[in-house]
């Protein structure tokens, strides 16, 4: 219990101190934001700050900090450390920078921002990378809820898929204040209530369960290595490239740059809290990582979430679990397709104020998502996890270049360059040894990951610090 409370306190302190430091470095101004200057009534619309925060939280969270945290809990309480320090020094910085830079670039999608600061080659890579990731996210958060609804109702999963797709169509096409701004705050509140309800149940010892204290021991039932597998598995609970595709959506709705820290950094810290709660629930509810692994293998993560909610919160928990497990991923999926539409629109220069022009992009994207939904969920999730963290790495390097150019003469770029280097090691090491990667031995993948990260760092220094000195 004390380990959990200590980690929870660190997240709060991280927001208050490190989040403030990052915000101070960026020097927010009172210049009119894109929401105020453009205000097209579709994507650029000034919204109340509390509503922007709740939409941002639900956009980036969904089931990410739940599924990822439960998966990370298989390694034991050591996952707490990655959630806490990853959130403060990588995830919070990543989300704040992607939102703030987009805010200062007229709400441009992240691929356009990357292209401006890393060059035309990276622009094309990021456009493709972003659209692929967003469609994967939309597909992942389409099939999970559809399958669970089929289990609960006895209806054909395909029918539920079509219903979810129909909702995606409306949410992707309609102005952001028609569906998303009206219902997301409610679902976001349910997500928070579910998480805090479980936290209080954990602290109260409901069901006679005892929270294990922090240990660095690898408790994975199959003895899989913590490095780099746990760092990829936790994903959204610590740092997530998907968030950078969502932040521009809310950058187009913020009334002031001074609101960026509570909205972007704050939402990431809130997600870190949710992930910490679910990681603690995972290592506590099933009494051992072996029990958690057996539950996840037997009934899957959707049902495991349901069991934990009901076990800790009773009937109320089951209702919230239904809202969380079904509504939250759907709300992540619809904004994923919306972001994909906007990314493609920026790519080809297609104005999106006209409904017909929005249809040109929305229909084929949803069609691809529908086709991908027929592929095994586990396969899609594995590729999503690596793609997600790789995008985070690229965005952090973009932030480092932006900060070097914007704040010349200071070392402010280190705020982004250090986590960018770390994530470079994580992502390259993982893909070199993973089943869906090159399947190299750890004796090769471990040193190779550090070598690749060193190369990325050298390239960054070459086009910034070393170029200036020469």
Language-model segments: residues:
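Hydrophobic, membrane-embedded alpha-helices of multi-pass small-molecule transporters
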Residues: 47-64, 201-207, 216-278, 323-332
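Extracellular loop-to-transmembrane helix junctions
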Residues: 1-19, 72-102, 111, 445-453
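Membrane-interface "cap" regions at the ends of multi-pass membrane proteins
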Residues: 10-66, 229, 259
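Hydrophobic alpha-helical segments and their helix-loop junctions in multi-pass secondary transporters
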Residues: 138-142, 146-163, 171-172, 191-218, ...
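Extracellular/periplasmic helix-exit of transmembrane alpha-helices
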Residues: 203-213, 265-307
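Helix-loop-helix module between adjacent transmembrane segments
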Residues: 10-15, 90-106, 110-175, 235-239, ...
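Loop-to-transmembrane helix boundary motifs in multi-pass membrane proteins
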Residues: 120-127, 131, 158-162, 266-275, ...
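Membrane-interface loop-to-helix entry segments
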Residues: 5, 9-27, 119, 129, ...
């Amino acid at each position: 219990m004390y380990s959990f409370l200590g980690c929870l306190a660190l997240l709060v302190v991280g927001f208050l101190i490190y989040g403030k430091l990052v915000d101070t470095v960026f020097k927010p101004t009172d210049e009119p934001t894109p929401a105020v200057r453009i205000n097209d009534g579709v994507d650029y619309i000034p919204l109340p700050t509390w509503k922007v925060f709740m939409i941002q939280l639900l956009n980036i969270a969904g089931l990410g900090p739940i599924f990822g945290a439960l998966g990370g809990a298989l390694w034991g309480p050591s996952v707490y450390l990655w959630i806490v320090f990853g959130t403060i020094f990588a995830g919070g910085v990543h989300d704040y920078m992607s939102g703030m830079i987009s805010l200062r670039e007229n709400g441009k999608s992240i691929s356009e921002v990357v292209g401006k600061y890393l060059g035309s080659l990276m622009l094309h890579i990021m456009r493709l990378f972003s659209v692929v990731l967003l469609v994967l996210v939309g597909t992942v958060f389409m099939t999970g809820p559809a399958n669970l609804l089929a289990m609960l109702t006895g209806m054909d999963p395909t029918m539920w898929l079509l219903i979810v797709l129909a909702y995606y169509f409306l949410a992707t096409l309609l102005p952001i204040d028609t569906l998303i701004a009206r219902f997301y705050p409610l679902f976001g509140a349910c997500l928070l209530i579910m998480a805090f309800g479980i936290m209080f149940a954990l602290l109260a010892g409901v069901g006679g369960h005892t929270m294990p204290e922090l240990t660095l021991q690898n408790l994975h039932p199959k003895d899989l290595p913590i490095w780099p597998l746990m760092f990829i598995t936790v994903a959204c609970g610590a740092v997530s490239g998907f968030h950078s595709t969502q932040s521009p959506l809310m950058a187009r709705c913020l009334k002031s740059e001074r609101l960026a820290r509570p909205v972007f950094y704050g939402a990431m810290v809130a997600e870190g809290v949710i992930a910490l709660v679910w990681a603690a629930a995972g290592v506590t509810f099933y009494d051992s990582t072996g029990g958690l692994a057996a539950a996840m293998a037997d009934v899957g993560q959707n049902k495991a979430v349901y069991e934990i909610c009901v076990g800790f919160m009773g009937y109320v928990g089951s209702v919230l679990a239904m809202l969380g497990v079904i509504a939250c991923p759907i709300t992540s999926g619809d904004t994923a397709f919306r972001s994909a539409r906007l990314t493609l629109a920026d790519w080809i220069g297609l104005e999106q104020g006209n409904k017909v022009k929005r249809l040109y992009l929305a229909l084929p994207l949803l069609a691809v998502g529908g086709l991908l939904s027929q592929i095994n969920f586990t396969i899609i999730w594995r590729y999503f996890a690596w793609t997600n963290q790789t995008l985070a790495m690229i965005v952090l390097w973009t932030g480092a270049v932006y900060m070097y150019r914007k704040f010349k003469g200071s070392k402010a770029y280190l705020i982004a360059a250090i986590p960018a280097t770390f994530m470079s090691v994580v992502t390259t090491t993982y893909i070199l040894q993973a089943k869906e990667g090159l399947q190299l031995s750890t004796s090769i993948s471990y040193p190779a990951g550090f070598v690749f990260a060193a190369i990325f760092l050298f390239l960054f220094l070459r086009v910034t610090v070393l170029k200036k000195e020469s």
